[in-house]
Amino acid sequence: GAATIGKAIAVASYNAASRFTNLNGSTYDAGVGETGDISNFSSHGPLVGEATPKPAVAGPGGTVLSAFSKNSAQFENYRSYQVQKVNSEGGTYYYGMMSGTSMATPAVTGIIALWLEANPKLTYENILDIMKATGRRDNHVGKVDANNWNATWGFGKIDAYNGLKKA
């Protein structure tokens, strides 16, 4: 996949929540693992033969709130995941719980974009250095090597605010 490209930033996923309550009041176990822990679907590194450690960082990807399109053919199949309904400007908009590295990656990408807005001269290496210096390493992340990295979490959980201060 794309995570194997030399200067791609591979993102692991951790769980923002492990349970949720939908619009009907039913509570579900999201099936992703414990809140704050690595998501059970997240791949582990390192990429063999690669000088750049992968994953670089972990972002929230397990049980996160996302927009649902009522125009999607799958909309009815995901009713049990819908947790918010917003009426605005004549339209009704739905939000629900989703999981995947496809949720974690856009979160991390948006954070990096914020850093680049603060400092457009940041390089790939600078971004990795910021992740290395500011990644949150809690009890879930556990032990890291001399470079603050491990094969499950990369440099830890991305920290948007402290990274922005470093940018």
Which residues does each PLM region occupy?
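Stable alpha-helical structural segments in soluble proteins, enriched in small hydrophobic residues
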Residues: 8-13, 104, 113-114, 163
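Short glycine-rich loop/turn motifs that provide flexible caps or phosphate-binding loops at active sites
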Residues: 12, 44, 58, 99, ...
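Hydrolase catalytic cores
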Residues: 55-148
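Generic recognition of stable, solvent-exposed alpha-helical segments in well-folded globular domains
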Residues: 6, 33-36, 103-110, 126, ...
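Zinc-dependent metallohydrolase catalytic domains
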Residues: 145-157
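Catalytic-core segments of hydrolase enzymes
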Residues: 1-68, 134-135
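Secreted peptidase-domain scaffold signal
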Residues: 157-167
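Hydrophobic alpha-helical scaffolding
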Residues: 1, 27, 31, 47, ...
